[in-house]
């Protein structure tokens, strides 16, 4: 990512569009002058990318609203399992948000952190046994095998709640979260403001979907 970002700077591009935390960090570190528009970052501030030439769209969701919707489906839910990649900053932020929201609603979070796909089957098996429902965060590792996780939830007759619309396509029962296609369109509008309308990124506060 750093090499690509530096190449863009060398080529003197008009703008850099960065998707996800690591690529946005590389872009932000590579230049103070070229506008950088990001998307699919949960916590831009913690990622250290908020500079005068950087703006974009965050995918951080209202987890408490999500849990409230889940409880409307089944008010008996007391334990929610979550599996996530502990090496992914976005995922750790989401799990922290999940714990905070759960404590406010009297729910216990059962978490399993993984760092590679091969760990997910066993972690999923454990979670469906120890929890009443599963919460799927917007996590790249989880997304790569979401069908595997939801199949185990369905087999155990447990609800799988997705934090993004793609999770439902992967077998989750319900979602109230991010549509990354729409996020891309919103990022495109910011790009137009900068490239066509002459706005400075510092004039455009980053926003959430």
Segments from the language model and where they lie:
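Short hydrophobic alpha-helices and adjacent helix-cap/hinge residues
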Residues: 1-209
């Amino acid at each position: 990512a750093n090499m690509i970002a530096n190449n863009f700077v060398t080529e003197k591009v008009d703008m850099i569009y960065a998707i996800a935390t690591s690529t946005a960090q590389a872009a932000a570190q590579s230049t103070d002058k070229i506008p950088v528009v990001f998307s699919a970052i949960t916590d831009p501030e913690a990622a250290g990318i908020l500079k005068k030439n950087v703006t974009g769209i965050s995918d951080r969701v209202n987890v408490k609203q999500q849990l409230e919707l889940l409880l409307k489906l089944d008010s008996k839910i007391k334990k929610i399992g979550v599996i996530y990649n502990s090496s992914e900053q976005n995922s750790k932020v989401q799990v922290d948000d999940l714990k905070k929201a759960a404590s406010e609603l009297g729910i216990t979070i059962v978490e399993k952190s993984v760092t590679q796909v091969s760990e997910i089957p066993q972690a999923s098996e454990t979670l469906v046994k120890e929890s009443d429902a599963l919460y799927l965060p917007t996590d790249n590792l989880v997304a790569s095998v979401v069908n595997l996780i939801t199949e185990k939830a369905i087999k155990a007759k447990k609800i799988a709640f997705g934090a993004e619309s793609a999770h439902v396509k992967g077998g989750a029962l319900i979602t109230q979260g991010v549509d990354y296609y729409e996020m891309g369109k919103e990022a495109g509008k910011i790009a137009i403001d900068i490239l066509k309308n002459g706005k400075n990124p510092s004039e455009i506060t980053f926003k959430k979907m």
